[in-house]
C-alpha cells in the first residue's frame, strides 16, 4: 500500500516552511531513519545544497534525519532510503533531472512498494500521469511530459479559486 502525502504547497500564508504539515510529516515518516530529499525543483533558483539544508532543518526539529545531499550518490541514496521527500519549485527542472539521473523507475518502484513519500508542489505534480497540467513555466525542455504515474490522474498544485478577503495565498 502506498503511503503518500501530496501537498499543493510547502508554505501557507503567515506560516514558516512546512509548518502546517509538521504533524502529518511526523506521522508519515514515523520510524524512518534515512529520508532522502530530492531538491531538483530549486525554488527561486537556490542551490540543491541550500534547499536540502532548508528541508533538513525542519525535519531535524521533528527528530527525523534527511540524508546529506551529494549529486554523485543520489541513486545509491534512493536505494537505501526508507522515506522520500520531493520539494517544490519548477516541475520542468525537477522532471528533467529525474530523467537525466535515471531516477524515474527507481522512484516509482520505491513509492509503489510503500516507502513513505511527501511531495510539495512540483513534488506532488510528478506523481500524476504527466506534468501537462502544471502552471510552471517550461524553463527547460524535458525528455517527456510523462511523470511517475503513481496516481491515476494529474494534479494542478496552486490551483487558484481565490475567495476575496482570505489570505491563504490563493490556493483552493
Model features per residue range: what roles?
Residues 10, 41, 89-92, 122-123, ...:
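Short glycine-rich anion-binding loops that position phosphate/pyrophosphate groups of nucleotides
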Residues 2, 37-40, 92, 110, ...:
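Aromatic-residue hotspot detector
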Residues 1-83:
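N-terminal beta1-alpha1 cap of cysteine-dependent amidohydrolase-like domains
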Residues 64-116:
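Flexible gly/pro-rich beta->alpha loop and the following alpha-helix that scaffold active-site loops
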Residues 53-54, 85-86, 134-138:
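Short, hinge-like loop/turn segments at secondary-structure boundaries
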Residues 36-39, 87-88, 156-158:
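Short beta-strands and strand-loop turn motifs
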Residues 5-6, 83-87, 118-119, 155:
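Structural motif
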Residues 95-118, 123-172:
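Active-site-adjacent pocket-lining segments in enzyme domains
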Amino acid at each position: 500500500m502506498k503511503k503518500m502525502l501530496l501537498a499543493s504547497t510547502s508554505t501557507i500564508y503567515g506560516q514558516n516552511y512546512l509548518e502546517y504539515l509538521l504533524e502529518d510529516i511526523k506521522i508519515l515518516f514515523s520510524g524512518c531513519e534515512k529520508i532522502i530529499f530530492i531538491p531538483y525543483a530549486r525554488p527561486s533558483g537556490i542551490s540543491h545544497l541550500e534547499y536540502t539544508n532548508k528541508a533538513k532543518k525542519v525535519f531535524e526539529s521533528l527528530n527525523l534525519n534527511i540524508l546529506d545531499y551529494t549529486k554523485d550518490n543520489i541513486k545509491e541514496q534512493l536505494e537505501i532510503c526508507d522515506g522520500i521527500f520531493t520539494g517544490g519549485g519548477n516541475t520542468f527542472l525537477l522532471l528533467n533531472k529525474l530523467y537525466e539521473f535515471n531516477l524515474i523507475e527507481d522512484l516509482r518502484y520505491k513509492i509503489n512498494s510503500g516507502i513513505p513519500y511527501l511531495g510539495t508542489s512540483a513534488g506532488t505534480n510528478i506523481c500524476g500521469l504527466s506534468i501537462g497540467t502544471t502552471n510552471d513555466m517550461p524553463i527547460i525542455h524535458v525528455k517527456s511530459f510523462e511523470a511517475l504515474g503513481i496516481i491515476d490522474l494529474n494534479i494542478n498544485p496552486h490551483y487558484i479559486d481565490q475567495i476575496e478577503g482570505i489570505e491563504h495565498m490563493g490556493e483552493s
